[in-house]
Amino acid sequence: MHRGVGPAFRVVRKMAASGAEPQVLVQYLVLRKDLSQAPFSWPAGALVAQACHAATAALHTHRDHPHTAAYLQELGRMRKVVLEAPDETTLKELAETLQQKNIDHMLWLEQPENIATCIALRPYPKEEVGQYLKKFRLFK
């Protein structure tokens, strides 16, 4: 399905044409590392699914934001960074900080257990959100 070129993509393209660097948009995900370890011992596939659920929900929820629209226009250039939170408390503290700072995100809760598993931000220029994520390392 072809949707045409939207205004967000035109802004990014116009910046590139003018010689200005286009904004690099990144979707950050923060996934609980402890879920892969005892006593939880979730398999890798289950953790990947949680990150996918959170990312999809964040993109859908913020689909009308210009950054999300521009991010989705360049399917071959989408950038995601998956970081790890050591536990549920740390993940929920991050969600609270993001909420207080008006950073658009989705805290994914696995149902029916209601377990917080992952946070996905909508696509952002890394300069806008890096300060909130710098204490988290890449998920391994």
From Swiss-Prot:
GO terms for molecular function: peptidyl-tRNA hydrolase activity. The keyword Hydrolase applies. GO terms for cellular component: mitochondrion. It catalyses: an N-acyl-L-alpha-aminoacyl-tRNA + H2O = an N-acyl-L-amino acid + a tRNA + H(+). Keywords: Hydrolase, Intellectual disability, Parkinsonism. Its EC number is 3.1.1.29. Disulfide bonds: none annotated. Changing residue 53 to Y: In NEDPBA; uncertain significance. InterPro entries: Pep_tRNA_hydro_II_dom_sf, PTH2, PTRHD1. Changing residue 52 to Y: In NEDPBA; uncertain significance. It is an enzyme of class 3 (hydrolase). The keyword Hydrolase applies. It is linked to Neurodevelopmental disorder with early-onset parkinsonism and behavioral abnormalities: An autosomal recessive disorder manifesting in late infancy or early childhood. It is characterized by developmental delay, intellectual disability, learning difficulties, behavioral abnormalities, and parkinsonism and spasticity usually developing in the third or fourth decades. Belongs to the PTH2 family. PTRHD1 subfamily. As a putative peptidyl-tRNA hydrolase, it might be involved in releasing tRNAs from the ribosome during protein synthesis. Some evidence, however, suggests that it lacks peptidyl-tRNA hydrolase activity. This is Putative peptidyl-tRNA hydrolase PTRHD1. It comes from Homo sapiens (Human).
